[in-house]
A protein has these predicted regions:
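Alpha-helical assembly-interface signal, strongest on the long, hydrophobic N-terminal helix that forms
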Residues: 1-61
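Short, conserved structural patches
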Residues: 45, 49-132
Length: 132
């Protein structure tokens, strides 16, 4: 009985840790995707390229904070070149959010200490809205 326990308990513990890891990574993916969509949307409703970039970055950061996601490092990139398009032309703003999630506390052998999660989202800019 002791031998079975010596083999079974660590394997069961590793199984539980992998379930926790999978859940944590999936929740982080959803949070990063939501932040990317919010950043793209916030950027697309601004009137200037510089306002779009700053608004998109602020929206992504706020979204990650609101969802309680603790990123070791965060990178938000907003491509607002659509604001240079002439009126009447369809264009999109794209936001890319990258978050390194710390998973070292799970102490799973062979697992890196962080997982990098990246999401990209686009939102259309109103083709006939005045741009400055």
């Amino acid at each position: 009985m002791a031998i079975e326990a010596a083999i079974g308990v660590p394997a069961f513990g590793l199984f539980i840790a992998m379930i926790i890891l999978g859940g944590r990574v999936e929740i982080a993916k959803q949070s990063v995707e939501a932040a990317a969509y919010e950043a793209a949307r916030a950027a697309s409703i601004e009137r200037t390229q510089s306002e779009a970039i700053s608004s998109g970055k602020a929206a992504a950061t706020s979204s990650l904070n609101d969802q309680g996601l603790q990123c070791a490092t965060t990178n938000v990139t907003v491509n607002a070149a659509a604001f240079n398009a002439p009126l009447g032309t369809t264009a999109q703003v794209t936001a890319r959010v990258t978050c390194k999630v710390d998973v070292a506390d799970l102490a799973i052998p062979g697992l890196p200490g962080t997982r990098t999660i990246t999401a990209t989202a686009s939102s259309p800019v109103d083709a006939y809205r005045e741009r400055r």
